[in-house]
């Protein structure tokens, strides 16, 4: 059984491997460059230490696959829709997004919209001019996936102390402390760089990042019960565990710069973009997670 978030958080996982029938947990662990050493103090007391000189992320299910949970932060994702169903998607193939959409203020008539794999379909239904206008509006209501914010390779290390208590039913206790960078992706954003009150001007973007320097302290035990039953368990504590904020709140926060133009134009407050994260200046970084115990 694979339980996420335990003491084994130092190991990146290939999630797709766990979907295979008959797969063992060890098959999902990804190799990472590291140094490891151990020392035996007595027959009952030992210590282990490691230092990783390489960081790798957990490989989540790719965009469009059966078990994928989203199509923008997973491998293959290139954009996120900000229109919440009010406009059509600019492309079917996410690899064509950059060639189709100009991040800024795309307008009907720009030749790049013809790069969309949806252009021929929409042009046959509505005509070339309307198809270009629809795709330009779609591009304006989409936020590009910006460069991922990967952590540094250094700064990951840990220590484990193991005690074998023969008098306590031959139980092995483990005590752990380590510092590592997140293997799981978290979502943040960049606020729109323009304040024009039109979906054609949305320049908000999505950032996939991996917070650094997460501290973990853990305890484990391993023993046997009557009847040959193995019993084991663990506890872990993180004083600064990163917790994801709802992605919709991040998107609304990234669109709050447009409120300046909406207010100046006399638009009713009901049309403003409101987020629990507050308001942001154009182009500001919107952190999409909090650190909690």
Regions from the language model: what does each represent?
Residues 29-33, 153-157, 213-217, 290-293:
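Residues that define the transmembrane beta-barrel architecture of outer-membrane proteins
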Residues 47-49, 171-173, 231-233:
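Transmembrane beta-strands of outer-membrane beta-barrel proteins
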Residues 2-5, 60-66, 186-192, 244-250:
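Outer-membrane beta-barrel translocator domains and adjoining extracellular loop/strand segments
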Residues 30, 42-44, 166-168, 180, ...:
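Outer-membrane beta-barrel channels and translocator barrels
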Residues 66, 74-151, 200-204, 258-290:
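Flexible glycine-rich, low-complexity coil/linker segments exposed to the extracellular/periplasmic environment
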Residues 1-76, 80:
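Outer membrane beta-barrel
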Residues 1, 51-57, 165, 177-183, ...:
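Transmembrane beta-strands of outer-membrane beta-barrel pores
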Residues 34-39, 159-163, 175, 219-223, ...:
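Residues on the lipid-exposed face of transmembrane beta-strands in outer-membrane beta-barrel proteins
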């Amino acid at each position: 059984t694979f339980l996420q978030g335990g003491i084994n958080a130092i190991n990146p996982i290939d999630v797709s491997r766990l979907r295979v029938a008959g797969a063992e947990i060890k098959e999902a662990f990804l190799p990472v460059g590291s140094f490891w050493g151990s020392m035996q103090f007595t027959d009952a007391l030992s210590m282990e230490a490691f230092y990783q000189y390489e960081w790798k992320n957990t490989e989540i299910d790719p965009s469009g696959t059966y078990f994928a949970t989203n199509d923008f932060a997973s491998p293959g994702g290139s954009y996120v829709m900000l229109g919440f169903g009010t406009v059509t998607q600019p492309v079917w193939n996410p690899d064509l997004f950059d060639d189709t959409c100009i991040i800024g203020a795309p307008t009907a008539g720009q030749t790049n919209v013809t790069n969309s794999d949806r252009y021929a379909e929409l042009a046959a239904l509505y005509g070339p001019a309307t198809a270009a206008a629809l795709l330009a509006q779609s591009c304006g209501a989409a936020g590009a996936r910006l460069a991922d914010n990967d952590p540094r390779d250094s700064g990951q290390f840990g220590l484990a102390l193991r005690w074998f208590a023969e008098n306590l039913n031959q139980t092995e206790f483990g005590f752990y402390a380590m510092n590592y960078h997140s293997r799981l992706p978290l979502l943040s954003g960049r606020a729109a760089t323009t304040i024009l009150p039109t979906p054609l001007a949305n320049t908000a973007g999505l950032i996939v990042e991996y917070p650094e320097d997460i501290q973990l302290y853990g305890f484990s035990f391993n023993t046997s019960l009557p009847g040959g039953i193995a019993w084991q368990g663990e506890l872990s504590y993180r004083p600064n565990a990163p917790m994801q904020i709802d992605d919709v709140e991040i998107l609304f926060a990234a669109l709050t710069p447009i409120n300046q133009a909406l207010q100046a134009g006399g638009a009713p407050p009901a049309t403003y973009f409101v987020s629990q994260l507050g308001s942001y200046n154009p182009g500001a970084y919107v952190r999409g997670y909090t650190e909690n115990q």
